[in-house]
A protein has these predicted regions:
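N-terminal alpha/beta PP-like core and its mobile active-site loop of ThDP/TPP-dependent enzymes
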Residues: 1-187
Length: 187
């Protein structure tokens, strides 16, 4: 659910000590292989000196837009051995800007008079974005919906009301069927 909601998460997973892994004990498993399908970034620290740098990198990876899952695997000895220094979290690149041609196409579609759904997700569900989406919907006739899974949706008095797209595919198709155009904002 964290991945669906684009929530930044750092998982720290314990592993056998580096010198014990070669013995292939009964509880030894391919943690990287297990973590990879559910993580955007996976790294195993090889020694105590790498833990702070790898940890800082895991934080930076999780902070990337739109929110990612980073898994850092720490063999036991990397966690209990001494390290000589810490690390600074690397800067995170700014999110990509929207292509101006895509914006022009959205404007064209919104002005077309054809049925348009504006599907909001992630930061599109925050107060400022909701306010803008409400204005766009009011002036264009677009209908607002939100994703079925969201980390946070700002609601309450004076906020724009949204209908969530159902999680069940058949129901979601029924909701989207009347629309000729779908514009994604954070979704």
């Amino acid at each position: 659910n964290a991945r669906k909601a684009r929530s930044p998460v750092v998982n720290i997973v314990g592993e056998h000590a580096t010198y014990h892994i070669r013995h292939d004990a009964p509880l030894t498993s391919d943690i990287e292989g297990i973590a990879a399908p559910v993580s955007d970034w996976v790294k195993t620290s090889r020694n105590a000196e790498e833990v702070s740098t790898d940890g800082a990198q895991a934080i930076a990876e999780a902070r990337k837009t739109p929110g990612r899952i980073a898994t850092l695997i720490l063999p036991a000895d990397t966690a209990w051995n001494e390290a000589s220094s810490g690390a600074t979290v690397p800067s995170v690149p700014n999110p990509e800007t929207v292509n101006s041609n895509a914006l022009d196409e959205c404007v064209r579609v919104l002005r077309s008079g054809e049925p348009v759904m504006l599907l909001l997700g992630n930061k599109g569900l925050r107060a400022g974005a909701l306010e803008w989406a409400g204005r766009i919907a009011k002036h264009s006739g677009a209908v607002l919906h939100s994703e079925s899974s969201a980390a946070r949706t700002e609601r309450g008095a004076g906020r724009i009301g949204l209908t969530r797209i159902p999680y069940v595919v058949d129901q979601a198709l029924e909701v989207t069927r009347p629309f000729k155009h779908l514009i994604l904002a954070g979704a």
